């Protein structure tokens, strides 16, 4: 299978074996508690153009959807395994950019016994205390685990390890595949070892297609899980047909279809026999609601029905 061949071909990231063990323990512990667990992939991958990489082809994604969704899943009682691009949006923290902290936080007095006390006006960081409390509660309960990736190789190896970790949970596991994964890569055997120099003239690169990992995930890695993929298009006339084609090819449960211009306020939940539009009203936007709340609420109901059907 081309997908498995690619995972084997790409270099395994440092620490992958340790992370595989950590993820397996995380999933097993939450499974023993009878808790549902969702793997959220978030952010974009990048592929190196040289073996000693200086240049990369990067799939940009802020990771905001994945981070916001993680918060909603945690509030709903799920365990969350958050596989995310380093320095992309992180649950709770993404609402508060570092420059806001620098402006709002003040030392409240001299440091004593190695502790630094900080204070801020509440209106300078609205919602910060609640976000901090929610994150720390999830961390203390052991229901949140974050794992970083950077390159395509990192992502594929860690995705496989995460899927194998969640597989024993059966239908109680959900995969929420929101990462922007590279479509092209340069095989290791065809990659120049050293930095590509501009003195060689215009650059011509031949890249190979990255096989979709939905196929081995659904068929081999976690065949009993509830799997959700995402489809982003700029043409609303083709979005449903593209989503349905993905469902037919990969035989998973749900595609969340997005149109670029309305990605923050409108999605279509597509299954093999239904299309459900989710829209944020102007009033909901004014209240600070986010579309991820509606997405997760819808998927939770579908996941419940999926579990009942399997049992």
UniProtKB/Swiss-Prot annotation:
It catalyses: (R)-4'-phosphopantothenate + L-cysteine + ATP = N-[(R)-4-phosphopantothenoyl]-L-cysteine + AMP + diphosphate + H(+); (R)-4'-phosphopantothenate + L-cysteine + CTP = N-[(R)-4-phosphopantothenoyl]-L-cysteine + CMP + diphosphate + H(+). Its EC number is 6.3.2.51. The modification N-acetylalanine is found at residue 2. The keyword Cytoplasm does not apply. The keyword Nucleotide-binding applies. It is an enzyme of class 6 (ligase). One of its GO terms (biological process) is heart process. Pathway: Cofactor biosynthesis; coenzyme A biosynthesis; CoA from (R)-pantothenate: step 2/5. GO terms for molecular function: ATP binding; phosphopantothenate--cysteine ligase activity; protein homodimerization activity. Keywords: Acetylation, ATP-binding, Ligase, Nucleotide-binding. Disulfide bonds: none annotated. InterPro entries: CoaB-like_sf, DNA/pantothenate-metab_flavo_C. It comes from the Eukaryota. Belongs to the PPC synthetase family. Catalyzes the second step in the biosynthesis of coenzyme A from vitamin B5, where cysteine is conjugated to 4'-phosphopantothenate to form 4-phosphopantothenoylcysteine. Has a preference for ATP over CTP as a cosubstrate. Homodimer. The mammalian enzyme has a preference for ATP over CTP, in contrast to the E.coli ortholog. This is Phosphopantothenate--cysteine ligase. It comes from Mus musculus. The lineage of its organism: Eukaryota, Metazoa, Chordata, Craniata, Vertebrata.
């Amino acid at each position: 299978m081309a997908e498995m061949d690619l995972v084997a071909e790409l270099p395994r990231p440092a620490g992958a074996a340790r992370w595989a063990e950590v993820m397996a323990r995380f999933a097993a512990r939450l499974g023993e508690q009878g808790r549902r667990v969702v793997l959220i992939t978030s952010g974009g991958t990048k592929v190196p153009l040289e073996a000693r990489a200086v240049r990369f082809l990067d799939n940009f994604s802020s990771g905001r959807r994945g981070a916001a969704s993680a918060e909603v899943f945690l509030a709903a009682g799920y365990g969350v395994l958050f596989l995310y691009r380093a320095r992309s949006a992180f649950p709770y923290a993404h609402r508060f950019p570092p420059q806001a902290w620098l402006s709002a936080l003040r030392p409240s007095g001299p440091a004593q016994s190695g502790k630094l006390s900080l204070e801020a006006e509440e209106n300078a960081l609205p919602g910060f205390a609640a976000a901090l409390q929610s994150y720390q509660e999830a961390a203390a309960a052991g229901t949140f685990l974050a794992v970083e990736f950077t390159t395509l190789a990192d992502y594929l190896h860690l995705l496989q390890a995460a899927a194998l970790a969640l597989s024993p949970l059966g239908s109680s596991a959900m995969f929420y595949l929101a990462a922007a994964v590279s479509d092209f890569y340069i095989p290791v055997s065809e990659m120049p070892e050293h930095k590509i120099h501009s003195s060689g003239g215009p650059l011509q690169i031949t890249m190979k297609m990255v096989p979709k990992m939905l196929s081995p995930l659904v068929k081999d890695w976690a065949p009993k899980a509830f799997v959700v993929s995402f489809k982003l298009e700029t043409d609303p006339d083709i979005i449903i047909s593209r989503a349905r084609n993905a469902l037919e090819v990969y035989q998973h449960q749900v595609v969340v279809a997005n149109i670029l211009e309305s990605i923050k306020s409108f999605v279509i939940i597509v299954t093999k026999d239904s299309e459900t539009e989710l829209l944020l009203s102007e009033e909901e936007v004014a209240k600070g609601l986010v579309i991820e709340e509606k997405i997760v609420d819808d998927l939770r109901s579908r996941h419940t029905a999926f579990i009942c059907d399997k049992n």
